[in-house]
Amino acid sequence: ARIFPHLHSQKDVDVLNTMLEHPPISDESEPGWYAKPYAELHRTSDTDRFVEDPSEGDYPVYGGSNVYQFSHDPSFVGIDPPEFWSVEEDVDPDSSAKRRVREKNYRKLKRALYHAFDGTGSQVSFVNNLLAEHRNEELSEDDVLLDCTEYRIVFRDIARAKNERTIIASVIPDGIVCTNTLHTLRPYEIDPDEEDLTCSPLYPVYERIFTDKSLFVALGLLNSIPFDYLMRTKVDTHIVMYKFEESQVPRLTKGDEWFEFIWQRAARLNCYGDEFEEMRDRLGGIEPAASTDEREEIQAELDAGSFYAYGLNREQTGFILDDFYQVGNPRRMTDEYFELGLEKYDELAQGES
């Protein structure tokens, strides 16, 4: 059953009716991208794969406190350094967090192959026989393509309606795995064809859900004030997966109004540092926003564009900004920021950007 949002006024109803015209973010029937969150590792049951001493690990294991909106390290905002680390699979597979992720996703790959080729009987026997026919090799965990081989969106699990922001999302560099305090959006879907079955490993069966640009349009919309306003009507202490999946987002793709406007600004906010040099090149050499003032202005522009993408008029936009919950000592959500957001909304109405 869908969650009915907590509404307090007729204006709330009018705003939400406009926002609900868009499809749920997890709806795969819509063209382009979609978002499927999941917990990659668990702090309790997978603790044997974590170490606390960075010198004993090869890569960080991120949790919710290691990211903020458009931030994957403390360069611009005070976030914690990683608490845990782990080792590569070829160093010690029995201690590797990446190996544990691979083990967990093996069944998903097997099931996808079984259904894609109209399997009957035992999944194990059918898939192994299918692959033996095509490549003389049964399915193995090494056929799993890890999500951490690609840049991907993550968002904090712990969230409250009375926090400064309810949704806190970032794109993180590749090579990092995450605990359940940081939900991840799958960057790949499994869509095999017969030609793929000759490959070892089976990486060609994986296709990216997001293009480079749509990854950042999705990030921009997730971190926008309109989406936050929607989510805080149904959040208590955590971002429950099904509540996130049913929430509506404009599914902007290349050629849509506001697509270029939003992805460019989200990318400039997020793609800083050496870890994002490759992504900056893939996006055509974008310049990351480096100063606090510049980042605030770009985020206000992004918020303004998101109001338009949702189809919210000026009165509705003003209502959301006036009604948005403010904490006592905000990082960014100040009266001045809300005024700047409305100013940017008006500038866009006049064709200024």
Predicted regions and their residues:
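S-adenosyl-L-methionine
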Residues: 1-353
